[in-house]
């Protein structure tokens, strides 16, 4: 299974976007809206544009062949917490889960279909599992 964008968020227990609505609960934690400010500066939401994947887990099958620091395309207002299964983080208003995986349940917050060669690599990795 591969959840993309809000599909990654649904893999968690829920979100502040819809209080009382349960997520699938495949991963622990709640998704939250980006803060209005970060380190004393206003933070725009939604987070739209290119940003880097950091701290890529070496054993990630989904991100195999993707270099730490590779750029992917985001458009989202809610973010998933960093958890044990996080395969990569991105920093925007603090660190959030950009990709996660446990066995055959995976998710990416970014849009691989808009992320050029890096996105194609991620999709190819998933299809070849």
Regions found by a protein language model. Name each.
Residues 1-48:
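Cysteine-nucleophile active-site neighborhood
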Residues 29-129:
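Amide-donor transfer/coupling interface in amidating biosynthetic enzymes
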């Amino acid at each position: 299974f591969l959840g993309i964008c809000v599909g990654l968020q649904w893999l968690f227990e829920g979100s502040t976007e819809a209080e009382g609505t349960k997520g699938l609960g495949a991963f622990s934690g709640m998704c939250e809206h980006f803060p209005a400010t970060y380190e004393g500066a206003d933070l725009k939401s939604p987070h739209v544009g290119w940003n880097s994947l950091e701290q890529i887990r070496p054993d990630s099958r989904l991100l195999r062949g993707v270099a730490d620091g590779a750029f992917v395309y985001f458009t989202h207002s809610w973010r998933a917490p960093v958890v044990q299964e996080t395969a990569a983080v991105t920093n925007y208003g603090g660190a959030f889960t950009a990709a996660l995986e446990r066995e055959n349940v995976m998710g990416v917050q970014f849009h691989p279909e808009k992320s050029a060669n890096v996105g194609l690599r991620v999709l190819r990795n998933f299809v070849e599992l």
